[in-house]
A protein has these predicted regions:
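Active-site neighborhood of glycoside hydrolase catalytic domains
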Residues: 1-62, 67-80
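Conserved alpha/beta catalytic core and glycan-binding cleft of carbohydrate-active enzymes
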Residues: 49-58, 62-174
């Protein structure tokens, strides 16, 4: 879209930017400055088209879907101090069928993107609804995986086990 937008193309020229990727980083930097002035943190999606994020403040956290880091960008950004939120498609894309992202996978994933816990700010589930035809299907795909993810997010490493979660899930189902 930005390639076709006259205002975006004008902003690229006026600010001496190379392309639409630079425009996104320019825009996110402005948003980050504003949010920081109000006492908030910024989070943006790490996406495949970025080759270099050096112009982007390292205090903007990234959600990382784990589609691969062939260019070493995520590793470089970690070295710069960027915080990451794990939103790996396996197991945190809840629009994927249970055969791809099983309840056990969600429950037993440690949430870490690296060996150092402090580098991962948290975990996040995705529910892309373009292939979810109705609320019944949405609920089926989301629950109890969301409960397993929540238990996993605030639990000690290695807890809950899958069997422990299944035992606790009885109470969880009563709340639904």
């Amino acid at each position: 879209r930005w390639e076709l937008c006259p205002d975006c193309q004008k902003a690229i020229k006026e600010n001496g930017l190379k392309n639409e990727d630079d425009l996104q980083m320019f825009f996110m930097t402005k948003v980050n400055v504003y949010l920081k002035s109000k006492g908030y943190s910024s989070v943006m999606w790490n996406y495949d088209k970025i080759d270099n994020a050096e112009s982007l403040s390292p205090d903007i956290a990234w959600t990382v879907c784990g589609m691969g880091d062939d260019k070493g960008l995520v590793k470089n950004e970690l070295m710069r101090g960027r915080k990451l939120i794990n939103t790996h498609c396996y197991p945190y894309y809840f629009d994927f069928p249970y055969g791809w992202n099983t309840l056990k996978m969600v429950c037993e994933d440690d949430g870490a993107l690296t060996d150092k816990d402090e580098e991962t700010w948290g975990i996040e589930a995705q529910m892309w609804t373009e292939y979810v035809p109705n609320m019944k299907r949405l609920e089926f795909l989301t629950f109890p995986r969301l409960g397993a993810m929540a238990e996993n997010a605030w639990a000690e490493k290695g807890y809950p086990s899958f069997s422990t979660f299944l035992h606790k899930a009885k109470d969880y189902y009563n709340l639904l």
